[in-house]
């Protein structure tokens, strides 16, 4: 139970983000409003995340958002989330500490030979995740972080499951 309680905030943000995206995407008028305020794809992974946030905020504070009365309670909830600095702070935090994991997966999932780099990349990824979590929590490297412990255990379990002798051999034979 301890593991899930540490990760619950991630699921809550994911559920809210999915609800916001679906609310806008599944209502023609709301989608039209979003497209009016932004020429970006809604909530797609991009370096233009900030522009999407600004567009969403402009959309929900516009007169058109207030005038359109379909599903007013959900619209109000969406507006509160989009204007919430706390919610966006959680989104940014999750993106910061999962970014090294995402980058590692993206790099390893290419046609570029990288087997010889996996050990060092994995260690580097874990250190970057730790750095982001500890920075956010205001902890020193020698202190204990419940969230980091849970994520570390997940990453190590994944490494143990996927690690094979070829990684070790490739790492050993890599000329530096």
Task: Give the residues covered by each predicted segment.
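Extended, C-terminal/distal alpha-helical "rod" segments
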Residues: 63-176
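Surface-exposed, charged/polar loop-rich segments
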Residues: 1-65, 76, 145-148
